[in-house]
């Protein structure tokens, strides 16, 4: 005669099966260990002197129209050692470089016609890995940010111009000093040569006089004849 198992035994078996699926708390080591990799941006030796969100455009000469370069943050970065300042802009999501060039003497920036939030400038840009002449237009969220950008741009360009003028003045002073030293040395050599020539002439004259005296004495001796 078959007997039915008690209901509580079924419950015990179900609970035991459930317990087997429970987390035991044991830690499982990952099959592949990923190491942290230091990410470098090339900006480690520079300090940001300006940092503004913006959208950048470049003028496509072939299509004769403005094309968006990217939206992100534009920075003026000052090198800690050389003091040179470059303009760098990266796309906010991909961090791809949109613009990368030094701000140099003679560069200028001006407001984009009809839009006080935008400004334009020419630059020799290196964003694509090679120098290219680019015409950029940058747009900001506010007029104030645009003015701040333009003011900083002009300050940097003027500062570079002053540095070049100072360097040119120093180079000119150094050249003049070198020329003065060379002229002095030339004059000294000329004077020394003149003195040496005078000495040589004096010696030659003295030699002639000495020879003349000797010749005169010899002639007198011949004229007087032998003594008797």
Curated annotation (Swiss-Prot):
<dbReference type="InterPro" id="IPR011993">
    <property type="entry name" value="PH-like_dom_sf"/>
</dbReference>
<dbReference type="Pfam" id="PF00638">
    <property type="entry name" value="Ran_BP1"/>
</dbReference>
<dbReference type="GO" id="GO:0006913">
    <property type="term" value="P:nucleocytoplasmic transport"/>
</dbReference>
<feature type="region of interest" description="Disordered">
    <location>
        <begin position="1"/>
        <end position="30"/>
    </location>
</feature>
<dbReference type="InterPro" id="IPR045255">
    <property type="entry name" value="RanBP1-like"/>
</dbReference>
<keyword id="KW-0906">Nuclear pore complex</keyword>
<dbReference type="GO" id="GO:0005643">
    <property type="term" value="C:nuclear pore"/>
</dbReference>
<keyword id="KW-0811">Translocation</keyword>
<feature type="region of interest" description="Disordered">
    <location>
        <begin position="159"/>
        <end position="228"/>
    </location>
</feature>
<feature type="compositionally biased region" description="Acidic residues">
    <location>
        <begin position="14"/>
        <end position="24"/>
    </location>
</feature>
<keyword id="KW-0539">Nucleus</keyword>
<feature type="compositionally biased region" description="Basic and acidic residues">
    <location>
        <begin position="1"/>
        <end position="13"/>
    </location>
</feature>
<dbReference type="GO" id="GO:0005829">
    <property type="term" value="C:cytosol"/>
</dbReference>
<feature type="domain" description="RanBD1">
    <location>
        <begin position="27"/>
        <end position="162"/>
    </location>
</feature>
<comment type="subunit">
    <text>Interacts with the GTP-bound form of RAN1, RAN2 and RAN3.</text>
</comment>
<dbReference type="GO" id="GO:0005576">
    <property type="term" value="C:extracellular region"/>
</dbReference>
<dbReference type="GO" id="GO:0051028">
    <property type="term" value="P:mRNA transport"/>
</dbReference>
<keyword id="KW-0653">Protein transport</keyword>
<protein>
    <recommendedName>
        <fullName>Ran-binding protein 1 homolog a</fullName>
    </recommendedName>
</protein>
<feature type="compositionally biased region" description="Basic and acidic residues">
    <location>
        <begin position="179"/>
        <end position="228"/>
    </location>
</feature>
<keyword id="KW-0813">Transport</keyword>
<keyword id="KW-0509">mRNA transport</keyword>
<dbReference type="GO" id="GO:0015031">
    <property type="term" value="P:protein transport"/>
</dbReference>
<dbReference type="InterPro" id="IPR000156">
    <property type="entry name" value="Ran_bind_dom"/>
</dbReference>
<dbReference type="InterPro" id="IPR045256">
    <property type="entry name" value="RanBP1_RanBD"/>
</dbReference>
